[in-house]
């Protein structure tokens, strides 16, 4: 079945902007939101899974630029508010498809997903039956069985039932866990799905771990249930900190005029607020020697001139130098270019009398870069790029 009605309802709930971002990053929504959708219940929050750390970070960057409010950030998940929606990015692991996500889930009633790569639902064979019967069937391969044990009460409050054999299966699966440190115990006690009992041991260190002592510590604690509604958050100050925690791949970095920059997940050069956990340091001179930048200019009577200032000329084989002194209130003292993958974003892209020029920039002339746009005080004009060639650039960029 196509479940077109449920798909339309999901898209309407998420909104066009978010749907397009989820498509671009080939995300998968799975779990409670899909269960609520098929049970005709109100959706409380949306758990979003990704195929790679690159896709997860790309999605977060897109959302960050549209004014989201991050409410919690743990090693396993990041929860943020986008307009009225509560979105939880799951990043303790990355998944190739819905079935691999289901392998980590605890109950079949959660095993529903919508894949934005295929724009189709994937449902476990017992998903609809067990939801209609309101019964819990446990998956012993779940990633966090202690959390599953805690979640039983949540489902019984929603009038689901669990048989004694199924409950025993959860307990026995918990017994099979290998836990040798407080950190491993905390990892099994929460940090996602609204279960945050890892906070029971947030002040404990890894040395001298003893499970029986840990059990006794719980008995001695007097804590209100509301205490466990908020997760143990990782500290972060900006987007880079969040990306550093989610990204498992090395980040290419370089220092330009004493400022730290990185090659972002979108491939563009941008200033780096904090150092990534793992990095590949690029040689700055080598980077500028091998990198070309681009700009659309007016071609008239054989001359290449600026669209912004018709008297400013770019001559192939010569240096072009910005006029005036740099200030923060105007374009004075700066020339503006695009990285190769961002030429379509150029202010003058599509102008009838426009042509694309290729330039080199030296480190000493570099001013700033962000989202594919580059500022410099001067450049060396290399050549005029043919229309067929730059259209191939755009075609290649759009196919990525």
UniProtKB/Swiss-Prot annotation:
<comment type="function">
    <text>Counteracts the host Gabija antiviral defense system. Probable nucleotidyltransferase.</text>
</comment>
<dbReference type="GO" id="GO:0016779">
    <property type="term" value="F:nucleotidyltransferase activity"/>
</dbReference>
<keyword id="KW-0899">Viral immunoevasion</keyword>
<protein>
    <recommendedName>
        <fullName>Gabija anti-defense 2</fullName>
    </recommendedName>
</protein>
<keyword id="KW-0808">Transferase</keyword>
<dbReference type="GO" id="GO:0052170">
    <property type="term" value="P:symbiont-mediated suppression of host innate immune response"/>
</dbReference>
<keyword id="KW-1090">Inhibition of host innate immune response by virus</keyword>
<keyword id="KW-0548">Nucleotidyltransferase</keyword>
<keyword id="KW-0945">Host-virus interaction</keyword>
């Amino acid at each position: 079945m196509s479940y077109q009605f449920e798909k339309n309802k999901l898209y309407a709930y998420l909104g066009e902007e978010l749907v397009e971002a989820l498509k671009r990053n080939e995300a998968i929504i799975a779990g409670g939101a899909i269960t609520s959708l098929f049970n005709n219940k109100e959706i409380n929050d949306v758990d979003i899974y990704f195929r790679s750390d690159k896709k997860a970070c790309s999605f977060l960057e897109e959302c960050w630029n549209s004014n989201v409010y991050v409410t919690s950030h743990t090693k396993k998940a990041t929860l943020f508010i986008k307009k009225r929606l509560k979105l939880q990015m799951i990043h303790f692991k990355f998944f190739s498809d819905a079935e691999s996500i289901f392998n980590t889930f605890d109950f079949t009633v959660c095993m529903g997903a919508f894949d934005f790569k295929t724009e189709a639902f994937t449902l476990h064979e017992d998903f609809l039956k067990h939801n209609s019967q309101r019964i819990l069937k446990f998956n012993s391969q779940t990633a966090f069985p202690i959390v599953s044990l805690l979640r039983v009460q949540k489902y019984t409050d929603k009038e689901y039932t669990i048989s004694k054999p199924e409950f025993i299966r959860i307990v026995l699966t918990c017994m099979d866990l290998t836990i040798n440190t407080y950190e491993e115990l905390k990892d099994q006690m929460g940090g996602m799905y609204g279960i945050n009992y890892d906070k029971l041991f947030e002040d404990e260190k890894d040395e001298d771990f003893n499970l029986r002592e840990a059990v006794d510590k719980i008995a001695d604690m007097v804590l209100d249930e509301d205490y466990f509604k908020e997760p143990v958050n990782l500290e972060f100050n900006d987007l880079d900190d969040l990306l550093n925690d989610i990204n498992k791949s090395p980040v290419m970095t370089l220092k330009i005029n004493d400022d730290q920059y990185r090659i972002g997940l979108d491939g563009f050069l941008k200033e780096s607020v904090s150092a990534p956990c793992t990095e590949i340091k690029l040689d700055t001179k080598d980077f500028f020697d091998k990198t070309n930048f681009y700009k659309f200019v007016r071609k008239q009577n054989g001359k290449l001139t600026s669209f912004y200032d018709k008297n400013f000329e770019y001559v192939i084989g010569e240096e072009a130098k910005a006029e005036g002194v740099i200030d923060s209130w105007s374009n004075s003292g700066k020339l503006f270019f695009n990285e190769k993958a961002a030429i379509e974003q150029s202010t003058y892209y599509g102008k009838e009398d426009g042509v694309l020029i290729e330039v080199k920039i030296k480190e000493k002339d570099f001013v700033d870069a962000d989202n594919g746009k580059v500022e410099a005080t001067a450049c060396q004009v290399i050549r005029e790029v043919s229309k067929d060639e730059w259209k191939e650039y755009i075609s290649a960029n759009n196919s990525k």
